[in-house]
């Protein structure tokens, strides 16, 4: 059970497989942080495709899958939306997600995904 001072983020990964090898890795399996702390969720990917899309989703305890962002491989701009920010680094094949000033409402399973 979560208390008001504890946020738990469970990390999972999704890999959309095509005829070319693709892989998404989220090494962190579970993260616990104190409320109001910042937390960064790491996502590293591998693909041979030159054009691809990266996604972040979250699934809160209520069960619905919530779309957060889609990033095109040709658009390496970072993005900030409220307390959420995404850092896309094509050179290191990473697409990390940061929650600033975490809140109990942020408790969820977070998914990073890759698609052609």
Curated annotation (Swiss-Prot):
InterPro entries: Ig-like_dom, Ig-like_dom_sf, Ig-like_fold, Ig_V-set, TCR_variable_region. The lineage of its organism: Eukaryota, Metazoa, Chordata, Craniata, Vertebrata. SUPFAM superfamilies: Immunoglobulin. The keyword Glycoprotein applies. Alpha-beta TR is a heterodimer composed of an alpha and beta chain; disulfide-linked. The alpha-beta TR is associated with the transmembrane signaling CD3 coreceptor proteins to form the TR-CD3 (TcR or TCR). The assembly of alpha-beta TR heterodimers with CD3 occurs in the endoplasmic reticulum where a single alpha-beta TR heterodimer associates with one CD3D-CD3E heterodimer, one CD3G-CD3E heterodimer and one CD247 homodimer forming a stable octameric structure. CD3D-CD3E and CD3G-CD3E heterodimers preferentially associate with TR alpha and TR beta chains, respectively. Residues 22-116 form the Ig-like domain. PANTHER family: IG-LIKE DOMAIN-CONTAINING PROTEIN, T-CELL RECEPTOR ALPHA CHAIN V REGION. Keywords: Adaptive immunity, Cell membrane, Disulfide bond, Glycoprotein, Immunity, Immunoglobulin domain, Membrane, Receptor, Signal, T cell receptor. Residues 1-21 form the signal peptide. It comes from the Eukaryota. It is found in: Cell membrane. One of its GO terms (molecular function) is MHC protein binding. This is T cell receptor alpha variable 19. V region of the variable domain of T cell receptor (TR) alpha chain that participates in the antigen recognition. Alpha-beta T cell receptors are antigen specific receptors which are essential to the immune response and are present on the cell surface of T lymphocytes. Recognize peptide-major histocompatibility (MH) (pMH) complexes that are displayed by antigen presenting cells (APC), a prerequisite for efficient T cell adaptive immunity against pathogens. The keyword Lipid biosynthesis does not apply.
């Amino acid at each position: 059970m979560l208390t008001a001072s504890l946020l738990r983020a469970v990390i999972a990964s999704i890999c959309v497989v095509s005829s070319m090898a693709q892989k998404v890795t989220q090494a962190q399996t579970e993260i616990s942080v104190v409320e109001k702390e910042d937390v960064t969720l790491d996502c590293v990917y591998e693909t041979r495709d030159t054009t691809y899309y990266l996604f972040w989703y979250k699934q809160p305890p209520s069960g619905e899958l919530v779309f957060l962002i889609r990033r095109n491989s040709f658009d390496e701009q970072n993005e900030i939306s409220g307390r959420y920010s995404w850092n896309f680094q094509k050179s290191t094949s990473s697409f990390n997600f940061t929650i600033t000033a975490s809140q109990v409402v942020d408790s969820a399973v977070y998914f990073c995904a890759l698609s052609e």
